[in-house]
Amino acid sequence: MTSLDLIPPQRSAAITALRLAPAEAAWLRAIGLSEGVRVTMLRGAPLGGPLHVRISTGAELAVDRGLARQVEVDAPTEEVPT
């Protein structure tokens, strides 16, 4: 297992657990980041800024790196075609 912030660009992984306070976990689930959802890392903003990800529904989201560190994912897959 690894965390969402460590997925390399253009790779995807499935969320396995949200290791967050209940309110933060509920917010992530409300925007589509929940257990079982596949997430593709598009890019990370420079200087520790947010991560730009795409979820399996096609929605693109910006996720704070601090929150992403607390989202467990399975092993990233091979590079995703663009």
Regions found by a protein language model. Give the residues of each.
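Short alpha-helix capping/helix-loop boundary micro-motifs
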Residues: 20-27
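Short, compositionally biased
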Residues: 30-31, 51-63
